[in-house]
From Swiss-Prot:
<dbReference type="GO" id="GO:0006412">
    <property type="term" value="P:translation"/>
</dbReference>
<dbReference type="InterPro" id="IPR008991">
    <property type="entry name" value="Translation_prot_SH3-like_sf"/>
</dbReference>
<comment type="function">
    <text>This protein is located at the 30S-50S ribosomal subunit interface and may play a role in the structure and function of the aminoacyl-tRNA binding site.</text>
</comment>
<keyword id="KW-0689">Ribosomal protein</keyword>
<dbReference type="InterPro" id="IPR038657">
    <property type="entry name" value="Ribosomal_bL19_sf"/>
</dbReference>
<comment type="similarity">
    <text>Belongs to the bacterial ribosomal protein bL19 family.</text>
</comment>
<dbReference type="Pfam" id="PF01245">
    <property type="entry name" value="Ribosomal_L19"/>
</dbReference>
<keyword id="KW-0687">Ribonucleoprotein</keyword>
<protein>
    <recommendedName>
        <fullName>Large ribosomal subunit protein bL19</fullName>
    </recommendedName>
</protein>
<dbReference type="GO" id="GO:0003735">
    <property type="term" value="F:structural constituent of ribosome"/>
</dbReference>
<dbReference type="InterPro" id="IPR001857">
    <property type="entry name" value="Ribosomal_bL19"/>
</dbReference>
<dbReference type="GO" id="GO:0022625">
    <property type="term" value="C:cytosolic large ribosomal subunit"/>
</dbReference>
<dbReference type="InterPro" id="IPR018257">
    <property type="entry name" value="Ribosomal_bL19_CS"/>
</dbReference>
């Protein structure tokens, strides 16, 4: 194992729950406003996972005031304090980019049973 891999392993300490595309997740993020720091919750559907070791990330999409909002979170960022899985989605794709073109009830995802 070379030195870069060792440093990456040290940085990858955060433990995320098992979730994938289609799952509804609530991401707790530290937000700094001036001298104050608070935790903000971003809840939506995970539409993509990117597994690249230390550079892993996941994309969460939600509808806010009728407008679609997507945010990419690095998996091992110290600003991501917690990820909660609200419900499991039953999907057949790894990337759900087609949800960007759908609106309303068409953009719903079936819940995985069992």
């Amino acid at each position: 194992m070379n030195i870069i891999d060792e440093i990456n392993q040290e940085q990858m300490q955060s433990v995320l729950p098992a979730f994938g595309a289609g799952d509804t997740v609530a991401v707790h993020v530290k937000v700094k406003e001036g001298d104050r720091e608070r935790v903000q919750i971003f809840e939506g559907i995970c539409i993509a996972r990117r597994n690249r070791g230390l550079h892993s990330a996941f994309t969460v999409r939600k509808i806010s005031n009728g407008e679609g909002v997507e945010r990419v979170f690095p998996s091992y960022s110290p600003l991501v304090t917690k990820v909660e899985v609200k419900r499991r989605g039953d999907v057949r794709r790894a990337k759900l980019y087609y949800l960007r073109d759908l609106s309303g009830k068409a953009a719903r995802i079936k819940e995985k049973l069992g």
